[in-house]
Amino acid sequence: MARYTGPATRVSRRLRVDLVGGDMAFERRPYPPGQAGRNRIKESEYLLQLQEKQKAKYTYGVLERQFRRYYVEANRQPGKTGDNLVVLLETRLDNVVYRAGLARTRRQARQLVSHGHFTVNGKKTNVPSYRVSQYDIIDIRERSRKMEWFEEAQDRLGEAVVPAWLQVVPESLRILVHQLPERAQIDVPLQEQLIVELYSK
């Protein structure tokens, strides 16, 4: 299955949640597309679980096979499977770049990582799904620092609310991973227990 590259607002409306952040088009019409969009259909338990999974997949830009692998790994780890799942998604490299304010959207962050603009602990890393660890140091590659995009990112650095588990060094745009996040620190509108129930069937 190919990755969805169409209008994010359409998906946000279908799932009734802003997947982009600050999506004015969604705020104007926060109901599913189509003439009957305003009339909510009766939602079964399965549909609610499926919608929650779709919400997580579209939020983090993950396809079904990879998402299932995340679930399997989360289920193996100690603690709550749902919490573990969200932490695994949140610690993807592309998401960390987005959370640090170096990209306006996760989709944009994924592109920047894929194009090889970052190093992790001094090594070039172009895999968006790379999982960061505590004490990792993420830098913009030397040849990429003069790009107009990163210069603009530096100018607007104060606009982003960087989560407490990360730190951005303003002069170099270096990202420091002080710790792995806890579920309470992750502000995504997910009911992950519904996803756990879906995969547990």
Swiss-Prot record:
Q: Does the keyword Ribonucleoprotein apply?
A: yes
Q: Which PROSITE patterns match?
A: RIBOSOMAL_S4, S4
**UniProt cross-references to SMART domains, sorted A to Z:** Ribosomal_S4 (SM01390), S4 (SM00363)
Q: Which domain of life is it from?
A: Bacteria
Listed A to Z, the keywords are: Ribonucleoprotein, Ribosomal protein, RNA-binding, rRNA-binding
Q: Does the keyword rRNA-binding apply?
A: yes
| Occurrences of domain S4 RNA-binding (ranges) | 91-154
SUPFAM superfamilies membership: Alpha-L RNA-binding motif (SSF55174)
One Gene Ontology cellular component:
small ribosomal subunit
Q: Name one GO molecular function term.
A: structural constituent of ribosome
A biological process from GO: ribosomal small subunit biogenesis
State the InterPro entries in the record.
Ribosomal_uS4, Ribosomal_uS4_bac-type, Ribosomal_uS4_CS, Ribosomal_uS4_N, S4_RNA-bd, S4_RNA-bd_sf
The family this protein is said to belong to = Belongs to the universal ribosomal protein uS4 family.
Q: Indicate the quaternary assembly.
A: Part of the 30S ribosomal subunit. Contacts protein S5. The interaction surface between S4 and S5 is involved in control of translational fidelity.
Q: Main role?
A: One of the primary rRNA binding proteins, it binds directly to 16S rRNA where it nucleates assembly of the body of the 30S subunit. With S5 and S12 plays an important role in translational accuracy.
Name under which the protein is recorded: Small ribosomal subunit protein uS4
Species for this entry: Corynebacterium ammoniagenes (Brevibacterium ammoniagenes)
